[in-house]
């Protein structure tokens, strides 16, 4: 027995380790076009201007709870782009493009993790599909917003994203706050699943400062990343045990941000805890939010809707071919006609308000 033999200490619970294309290789395989790059940059710059209060419009992050069929999702994107152009003078539309689903327990973790929805976990193909879909959305001319869940994902798809959000289950995580401080987009922090604001406000504060953390370069090499801090983190209110979109909750959040000497920017997620997971309640939430803006609440900068071609949701199937490509497999969504009606209402009310505000400034 050689003196060098040790008991096996590593990878005791690892079945296999498969190499993955580097971010540089993936970007070379699916490169940005000038048109796509312009969409992403315009999206980021517009969101920054809205968050700075220089642009009086409201932004709307609208799209499926999760994407499971790319053809249906592209059809959705084209419909959304047509509508976005019609309402662009008062509402700036970003498509919600979620490929990763944080699960409270277990379940399908999204297109990147298991693109074929059959427990084959072809993650490299999932990343390629995600990157290619984001490229298509950018080519259509829609900025995209997504959830920052896997900490390596920004290296693979971050150049195609205009808005990121850190979800309720990860807003307290040090790793995500560090990445938020270095990410190239405005970034939302959701309140905790229990409704508490502390994690989101501390997340905003943390992301605004510099950090030093470990990551992987475009060539897949470990490196230390040192960040300057992100000037555009904001709180996303998604409800908890009870909703938190009402005027008192929003005023409380604004006060907490002011007390912490942080920018008073709030986005309302009309779904999740604010809708009690009932998709058709999203309209009530949005109307309440618009009423608050009309009453002079200036901290509300945007809202989120979970929307799909068809409403409701469907259970997962052992045979994914049996799934309806146009209906959510995760949270309930509102259908397209409802989405269009709500966005047009938001546009009409914001247009009127912006007109009144500009007239009162002239006088």
Feature-to-residue mapping (PLM):
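Short, basic, low-complexity termini and linkers enriched in Ser/Thr/Gly/Pro
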Residues: 1-4, 355-363
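Active-site-facing alpha/beta catalytic cores
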Residues: 5-10, 77, 90-245, 249-250, ...
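N- or domain-start disorder-to-order transition segments that initiate the globular core
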Residues: 10-52
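Gly-rich Lys/Arg/Thr-decorated short loops/hinges at beta-loop-alpha junctions or inter-strand turns
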Residues: 23-31, 227-239, 327
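Conserved phosphate/anionic-ligand binding catalytic regions in large, soluble enzymes, centered on
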Residues: 59-72, 331
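Conserved, mostly hydrophobic/aromatic
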Residues: 63, 268, 335
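Internal helix-turn-beta structural module
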Residues: 308-354
């Amino acid at each position: 027995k050689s003196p060098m033999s040790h008991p096996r200490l590593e990878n005791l619970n690892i079945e296999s380790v498969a190499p993955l294309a580097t971010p540089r290789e993936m970007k070379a395989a699916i490169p940005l076009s000038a048109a796509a790059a312009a969409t992403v940059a315009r999206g980021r710059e517009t969101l920054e201007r809205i968050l700075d209060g220089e642009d009086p419009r409201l932004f709307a992050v609208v799209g499926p709870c999760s994407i499971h069929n790319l053809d249906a999702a592209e059809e959705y994107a084209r419909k959304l782009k047509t509508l976005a152009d019609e309402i662009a003078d008062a509402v700036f539309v970003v498509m919600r493009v979620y490929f990763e689903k944080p699960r409270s327990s277990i379940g399908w973790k999204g297109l990147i993790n298991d693109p074929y929805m059959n427990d084959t976990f072809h993650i490299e193909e999932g990343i390629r599909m995600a990157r290619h879909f984001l490229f298509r959305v950018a080519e259509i001319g829609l900025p995209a917003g997504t959830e920052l869940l896997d900490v390596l994902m920004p290296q693979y798809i971050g150049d195609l994203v205009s808005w990121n959000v850190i979800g309720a289950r990860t807003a307290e995580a040090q790793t995500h706050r560090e990445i938020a401080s270095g990410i190239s987009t405005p970034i939302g922090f959701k309140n905790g699943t229990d409704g508490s604001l502390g994690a989101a406000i501390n997340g905003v504060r943390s992301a605004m400062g510099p950090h030093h953390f470990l990551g992987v370069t475009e060539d897949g090499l470990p490196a230390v990343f040192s960040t300057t801090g992100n000037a555009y983190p904001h709180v996303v209110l998604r409800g908890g045990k009870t909703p938190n979109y009402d005027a008192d909750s929003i005023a409380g959040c604004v006060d907490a941000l002011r007390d912490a000497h942080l920018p008073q920017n709030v986005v309302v997620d009309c779904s999740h805890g604010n809708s009690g997971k009932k998709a058709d309640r999203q309209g009530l939430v949005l109307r309440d939010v618009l009423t608050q803006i009309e009453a002079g609440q200036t901290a509300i900068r945007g809202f989120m809707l979970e929307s799909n071609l068809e409403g409701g949701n469907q259970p997962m199937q052992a045979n994914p071919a049996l799934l309806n490509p146009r209906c959510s497999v995760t949270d309930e969504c509102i259908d397209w006609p409802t989405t269009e009606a709500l966005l047009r209402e938001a546009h009409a009310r914001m247009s009127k308000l912006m007109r009144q505000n500009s007239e009162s400034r002239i006088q």
